[in-house]
């Protein structure tokens, strides 16, 4: 079954200078349990697309369906509940700098209404999974970039999501740290059967971790398919840049 289905999604922004069409009739199907890459140059529309997947950005037109349920038809309370099933990690980690590592991971569970003891127990389990159990009482300023991203991953898993969206999650990291984060994401995918969507401009990330990929240019998807097929037999000019 399709975990995520994007149907003819367009997104237009208006400004004093005029309108900008960030997405143009994008359609995409991502199956349950796979690691799916979306790649393109800066300004291709990748981040806008991933933000439409959890309705942080509402499409100007088109539909976003999660397990067959259209997000556009949900009331605000239903949408908040649906978003609990969609974790997200970012390039710059977005951690609460005045809170400890443990409290950062607890934060989304507090928002859910979980009791402190329950939240802390789960946060400790998640920190063990991401290899940071000994850093529970540290603060983000005391961590390396890779460690910060591991905290962000643990926090994203706190609500037991079915989907994890990764927006340029490794682009601020060195190659060795990137490799360790990708291995962690693969482990999480296997352990929890979470569908992972990776937004990146790094071909090495797609080759390392993704089974399928969509290539974007100027707000459109120009090519989709399995990673092996796409890069063995590229059809688009954009794809040729990556092979």
Language-model region placement:
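Conserved ABC ATPase signature
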Residues: 139-143, 147
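A short, surface-exposed alpha-helical micro-motif characterized by mixed small hydrophobic
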Residues: 206-208
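Helix N-cap at the start of a conserved alpha-helix in ABC-type nucleotide-binding domains
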Residues: 175-177
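Conserved ABC ATPase "signature" region
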Residues: 69-70, 106, 110, 117-134
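A short, proline-enriched helix->beta-strand linker immediately N-terminal to the Walker B motif
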Residues: 158-162
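ABC ATPase "signature
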Residues: 224-225
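Helix-to-loop junction immediately C-terminal to a conserved catalytic motif
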Residues: 54
